[in-house]
């Protein structure tokens, strides 16, 4: 494949993701507005549809603030790493064909999402501000903690599937979703994705009343916009993964509808994220950690052992493709 074609393929992936992220922010503001008995953005363009474009332009033409004692290289590298990891994670995902057909597709997705934690840590340290550092440490502790349960839940589903490829998950769910056999894991996965993406009620990284906006307190303009884009891209990615793992459309009679089915289910899951934000108050930090280490972790480990022992005892391990 020629370099120009590779670039074109990458752009065909990245541009729709960025457009989806832009309109997810508008949808969030509209939904929160209607749930609070007020209108959301309705001035810029027809029914406020051009509001994300106006917000993006405003952020990117702002002058970036560079604190005097901050580390300038890391300060710029942190948002770049965040947005790069958020875009790179889409490579193994079939839409309907993947950009990189990897044998260990799901494992690579987990590894790339873990790499994004470094951007938060770098941002807090490079700002040379105690508020940013405390915010980044809290965010990193939360993200790393919930990645443990995400990894174990992923392992439990892969034991039933018999491989790490996303295509195999699609074939496995031809007759029934994994949601029907693993609904406790699905619920824990969904709650863990809320915590992993720093969404309400687990938005402790941006607790304005406690942390002065968290790890990105020294960021403004373009670098702040990159963090913002990465956060919302990760929300879409996690919901897409939830759909692939537990409610996969599968190879139905109409394979051409696979992508439309996947997008529709992902949209519903994204809307549920916004509904949860409008409905629930923020958890305390100790409640967040208690939920993971004392409830989710023992339950996921027990279910993982159950799935493995069940498959072995009835000789039901699927063959590797």
Curated annotation (Swiss-Prot):
This is NADH-ubiquinone oxidoreductase chain 1. It catalyses: a ubiquinone + NADH + 5 H(+)(in) = a ubiquinol + NAD(+) + 4 H(+)(out). It is a multi-pass membrane protein. It is an enzyme of class 7 (translocase). The lineage of its organism: Eukaryota, Metazoa, Chordata, Craniata, Vertebrata. It comes from Varanus baritji. The chain crosses the membrane at residues 5-25, 74-94, 104-124, 151-171, 175-195, 227-247, 256-276, 296-316. Its EC number is 7.1.1.2. Belongs to the complex I subunit 1 family. Core subunit of the mitochondrial membrane respiratory chain NADH dehydrogenase (Complex I) that is believed to belong to the minimal assembly required for catalysis. Complex I functions in the transfer of electrons from NADH to the respiratory chain. The immediate electron acceptor for the enzyme is believed to be ubiquinone. Its main location: mitochondrion.
């Amino acid at each position: 494949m020629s370099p120009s074609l590779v670039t074109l393929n990458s752009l065909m992936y990245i541009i729709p993701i960025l457009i989806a992220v832009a309109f997810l922010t508008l949808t969030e503001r509209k939904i929160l507005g209607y749930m609070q008995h007020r209108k959301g953005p309705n001035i810029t363009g027809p029914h406020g549809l051009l509001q994300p474009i106006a917000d993006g332009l405003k952020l990117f033409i702002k002058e970036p603030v560079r604190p005097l004692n901050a580390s300038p290289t890391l300060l710029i590298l942190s948002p770049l790493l965040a947005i790069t990891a958020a875009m790179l994670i889409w490579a193994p995902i079939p839409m309907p064909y993947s950009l990189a057909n990897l044998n260990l597709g799901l494992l690579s997705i987990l590894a790339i999402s873990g790499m994004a934690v470094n951007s938060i840590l770098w941002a807090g340290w490079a700002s040379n501000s105690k508020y940013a550092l405390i915010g980044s440490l809290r965010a990193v502790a939360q993200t790393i903690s919930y990645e443990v349960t995400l990894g174990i839940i992923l392992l439990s589903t892969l034991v039933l599937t018999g491989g790490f490829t996303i295509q195999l998950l699609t074939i496995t769910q031809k007759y029934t979703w994994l949601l029907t056999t693993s609904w406790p894991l699905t619920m824990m996965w969904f709650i863990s994705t809320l915590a992993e993406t720093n969404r309400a009620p687990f938005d402790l990284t941006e607790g304005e009343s406690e942390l002065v906006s968290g790890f990105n307190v020294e960021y403004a303009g373009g670098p702040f916009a990159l963090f913002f884009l990465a956060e919302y891209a990760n929300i879409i990615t996690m919901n897409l993964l939830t759909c692939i793992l537990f409610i996969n459309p599968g190879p139905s009679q109409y394979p051409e509808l696979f992508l439309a089915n996947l997008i529709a289910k992902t949209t519903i899951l994204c809307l549920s994220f916004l509904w949860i934000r409008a409905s629930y108050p923020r958890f305390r930090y100790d409640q967040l950690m208690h939920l993971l280490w004392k409830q989710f972790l023992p339950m996921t480990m027990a279910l993982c052992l159950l799935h493995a022992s069940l498959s072995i005892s009835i000789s039901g391990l699927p063959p590797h493709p």
